[in-house]
Amino acid sequence: MAEDSESAASQQSLELDDQDTCGIDGDNEEETEHAKGSPGGDLGAKKKKKKQKRKKEKPNSGGTKSDSASDSQEIKIQQSSKHNAIWQQISAGAAMGGDTMEGEWIDLRMYHKNPTIPIQKLQDIQRAMELLSACQGPARNIDEATKRRYQFWDTQPVPKLNEVITSHGAIEPDKDNIRQEPYSLPQGFMWDTLDLSNAEVLKELYTLLNENYVEDDDNMFRFDYSPEFLLWALRPPGWLLQWHCGVRVSSNKKLVGFISAIPANIRIYDSVKRMVEINFLCVHKKLRSKRVAPVLIREITRRVNLEGIFQAVYTAGVVLPKPVATCRYWHRSLNPRKLVEVKFSHLSRNMTLQRTMKLYRLPDVTKTSGLRPMEPKDIKAVRELINIYLKQFHLAPVMDDAEVAHWFLPREHIIDTFVVENPSGKLTDFLSFYTLPSTVMHHPAHKSLKAAYSFYNIHTETPLLDLMNDALIIAKLKGFDVFNALDLMENKTFLEKLKFGIGDGNLQYYLYNWRCPGTDSEKVGLVLQ
């Protein structure tokens, strides 16, 4: 992760780019708002933008559209290009300083046409062009990304965007000499390690995220991570207090910044590495020109390095150097009336609300025999199921019993897991989804949108299509409004058939200090909250 000595390039990254945005790439503080994903999974883009997207974009499900899948497009889901998940998700951003090469070309042309123009004026024009480019927003695809400069990431052990990768392994060797002192924050701010067992501190973090974390482009929805969800996401087995890294105002001790890391064993092709997942980077909206986010990234890197860990995994809705995989969110309406009322989605031409509700209607009972909530007695069997199943993918976790217990045992309003037990008492399959509501802003009646996110779904005997249809039924019965899923693992086999609608933004997966060939979304077996 970030270098331990303060290089000139890294120091420069703290001084440039004063956009009123937030990010984790160190190049642009915008992308805390983009990495995790829009609330509810890619919500709220303008209808005009969505219609334009649909004209030129065809869902790629790996198969032929069924009639029901075609019908499901009658209700349009408004989606922005933000996505779940920061470093879930590192949350990254546009290239700092924009496309300076373009600025240089403009200057050269102007100089040849009029060599009497002062060099200083040409330099001023170049700087203006760079700022304009930076303000045009983060790169959403490889073509856009290759035109940008990434001054922060260019100093980091990550592959270059144009690099052809055929090897596997660490980019930099593990270090022995790790910086012992925290990095310096801008004047007026101080570090604080957050003790989330303290209810007041947990409430402070909840408030910071609730008021400043991921929103959609139209400021209609905002993720609403409950305090209980935060404890689940931030304190898995092996969690460390010092990896809950906060920033406060020195004068009044107000919490204005946060970044976290949690440990995980991740298999990358044939190598299993102990690494961290980086998540929940957030800087208060009013302080995003203070360059706090780059220091947060470097500080969490230093703290992780001190524990002997030198690799990380993260996701972002923008393109940085260099994605190992790109996935897409899909969305399945469970409560069409509410989704239309809050403008999460809208009715297409010649489609009434009643027809839409009929289209998305689900049975009242599940189909799979032996389906029941997971219990503590199932931990070992679930661990065996998931670890064997995930071996077919190129990027996947390797879990022990404690991790399976933490991530999958049902917790109300946080995680739901159902197992399939056959007549002989053997567990053959399981499904899981976690709960992440969004606050609905500026609506007179609806204050919250309840979204389910597909987690891990393992099948050995039950067809995956049947298993996921049961997941939709359970989510509907539990009062969810929408069910979201990425097109990773084997999900493409059921998305269209179960009337999911495709989102219009990608979720990139990244590895820090690890080089390996890229992989397709169906070979990704890792889901970050």
UniProtKB/Swiss-Prot annotation:
Residues 61-82 have a biased composition (Polar residues). It is found in: Cytoplasm; Membrane. It is a peripheral membrane protein. The modification Phosphoserine is found at residue 38. Tetradecanoyl-CoA binds at residues 153, 281, 283, 289, 291-293. Residues 15-32 have a biased composition (Acidic residues). Its EC number is 2.3.1.97. Its main location: cytoplasm. Residues 46-57 have a biased composition (Basic residues). It is an enzyme of class 2 (transferase). Keywords: Acyltransferase, Cytoplasm, Membrane, Phosphoprotein, Transferase. It catalyses: N-terminal glycyl-[protein] + tetradecanoyl-CoA = N-tetradecanoylglycyl-[protein] + CoA + H(+); N-terminal glycyl-L-lysyl-[protein] + tetradecanoyl-CoA = N-terminal glycyl-(N(6)-tetradecanoyl)-L-lysyl-[protein] + CoA + H(+). Belongs to the NMT family. Adds a myristoyl group to the N-terminal glycine residue of certain cellular and viral proteins. Also able to mediate N-terminal lysine myristoylation of proteins: catalyzes myristoylation of ARF6 on both 'Gly-2' and 'Lys-3'. Lysine myristoylation is required to maintain ARF6 on membranes during the GTPase cycle. This is Glycylpeptide N-tetradecanoyltransferase 2.
